[in-house]
Structures are given as structure tokens and as C-alpha cells.
Amino acid sequence: SLLHRADAGNMSGIGLTMEGINQNPFIFALMLENVWQDTPVDVDAFLGDYLSCRYGLKDAAPDVKSGITRSWKTLVNSVYSNHTDADGGRQSVMTKRPVFASGPDSLQKPGNFFPLDSLVTAWDGMMNCAGALSGSDGFRYDLVDVTRQVLVELLDRLHYESQEAFYSSDSRMFIQRSSEVLSLMHEIDDLLATRKEFLLGPWVEAAKALGTTPEEKSLYEWNAKTQITLWGKPGSPLNDYACKN
């Protein structure tokens, strides 16, 4: 009814401009679905339609449909169900400024608002469907993204254990965990390099393409790089605001 009002003018719909980098397509699809609803969205029904369209499940075997749906319901009820008062997501050692606990009393165990075993269960289910759904680009992206999160959670725990070993004077464990942290960082980087959505080059070039003059292109390039690094000029009070994990 809003679109057909006499005073609608040039309105043709509603969109989103996020402080983000095109991640979590499920959340934004759900948000836009909710815009035109008078009642709360039936998430289970929406999820079924979403997965059918995103992964092309029309001709998929029943066990594949049920398996991938079960994985996503696990994600919806854990990763996508934050009922805490936390402001923003938890930062990971992978993306925030390098930090090492100043002492044993300042050590903080990594944690999240969702149980890690739920994330791993969802990931395992997706892996079981990988052979059948490998032809879906949407599935391949989601599998990389969920795998990334699983590995990042592991990385943070290894980083914590390296600090714990340091302050326990356990040099052998400190060296082992530190080596594992650095190795896993490279593995996560290799994983993300399989998708253009996680590469710096396409991100910067897409921003530059919006410019019509050399000056505009340079400005947009600066903004694109700033958004994923300092988020402002050097000395900005925003600490790690660009962290996008």
C-alpha cells in the first residue's frame, strides 16, 4: 500500500546501506523480508525458501535437503540468536590489533554468546552435504564462511593457551601453541583466498569503479582501505572499529 500511495513520489522500495562488507547475506535477506510483513516472519518457512533458492535444492535428494536444513537451523538457533547485551560481535585475534596479556591475572578465556559445539555441529553437517551441493556458488561461499568462523574460534583458543603457557613458564607448550597460531593464520588466509568476496583486490577495485574522475577514484580507494583498517585518520579514538570478524 505504501508503494501505491499518491504521495509515494519516486519511492520504489526499501534498501540497506550497512557499515559492513557484504557478509551475512542470510541476515539481510531476512531483514528485507521483514520490511513488508505485518506480523513476525516465520523463520522456519523463510529458511526453507531461502535455502531452496540459494542452493538450488529443488532436485536435491531428501537426505541432502534435511541435512543442510538441520545445519542451518542449528546456526539460526545459535550463531544468529544473540540474546545478550553485548554491543557488536566479539573481536578475534585474527583481525584486531596484536595484543598479549600483561600478566596472568589479565588473561581472558575466549568465549562467545553461542556454544562452540553448535557451530561445529552445523559446519560438520554442511561438510557432509558438500559433495551434493558443490555446484551451488552460494553454498560454496557459505561453507567457506562457516569454516572461517570455526577456524577463528580455534585460533583464539590456541592464542589463549599460548599466553597461559607463557605465564606458567611452560616454554615447550608456549612454542608449540605459538607455532600453531601462526600456522593456522596462514591456513585461514589460504581458505579465504578461494573466494573473491574475501580478497582485497576486488574490494578496492569495486570502490574505485564508482569514481568518474581520478580524484574520485583515489578518494574511494582511500575510503575502501580505511574501512577495513583504521576506520579514520591515524590517532582516531576508535580502536579496532574496522574489525570485521
Give residue ranges: language-model regions:
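Substrate-binding groove of N-acetylhexosamine-processing glycoside hydrolases
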Residues: 1-245
